[in-house]
């Protein structure tokens, strides 16, 4: 009976990253999105990769509840200087806005490490953190590597790995990420 009547308590992909600081947030997201899906009955739904954890949670919900919907992740849209576009960017003063580009630069440096053969997550995360910490206005919430589908922590870059960061600039918390693919 438990296979037919799935209880949607959303553990797993909600337990890491943003879910640590925002307990219950993804339960609310699932409630709103599932109601929308029931009303609209789409064949496809598009979600941004910038909110990669939310994308994974929605994919899991669709699978668990047997919605016949294809969930498609859309690439991160960026400002000219690399900062991920977000409504939160408007809360940054000009100094914080300039400083916030360190997230993209640090993640890109981590991506290059992986492209050059590094697979040890602790080395990659440590390097990304050290790059972000060069910016005095940046306060790291997290920099982590997790399985891109399950959002479970990983120790090695193998398969699809989400490398994600959340960083405060003043009171504004920004998120960004990339997916490393290695078989």
Residue ranges of each PLM-predicted region?
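Phosphate/ribose-recognition catalytic cores of enzymes acting on nucleotide-derived substrates
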Residues: 127-183
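Glycine-rich, Lys/Arg-enriched anion-binding loops that position phosphate/diphosphate groups
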Residues: 51-141, 146
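Short, surface-exposed amphipathic charged segments that create phosphate/polyanion-binding patches used
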Residues: 7-9, 83-92, 155-160
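Internal active-site segments that recognize and position negatively charged phosphoryl groups
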Residues: 48
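Short, small-residue-biased leader/transition segments that mark boundaries at the very start
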Residues: 1-5
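Active-site glycine-rich loop that binds ribose-phosphate moieties when present
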Residues: 25-35, 57
């Amino acid at each position: 009976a438990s296979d037919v009547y799935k209880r949607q308590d959303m553990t797993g992909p909600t337990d890491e990253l943003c879910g640590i600081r925002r307990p219950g947030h993804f339960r609310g997201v699932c409630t709103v999105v599932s109601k929308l899906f029931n009303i609209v009955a789409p064949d496809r739904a598009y979600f941004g990769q910038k909110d990669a954890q939310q994308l994974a949670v929605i994919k899991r919900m669709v699978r668990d509840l047997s919605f016949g919907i294809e969930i498609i992740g859309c690439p991160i849209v960026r400002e000219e200087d690399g900062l991920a576009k977000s409504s939160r960017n408007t809360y940054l003063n000009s100094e914080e806005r300039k400083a916030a580009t360190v997230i993209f630069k640090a993640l890109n440096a981590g991506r290059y490490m992986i492209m050059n053969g590094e697979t040890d997550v602790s080395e990659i995360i440590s390097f990304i953190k050290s790059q972000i910490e060069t910016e005095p206005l940046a306060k790291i919430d997290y920099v982590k590597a997790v399985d891109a589908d399950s959002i479970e922590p990983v120790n090695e870059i193998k398969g699809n790995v989400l490398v994600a960061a959340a960083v405060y600039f003043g009171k504004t918390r920004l998120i960004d990420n990339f997916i490393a693919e290695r078989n």
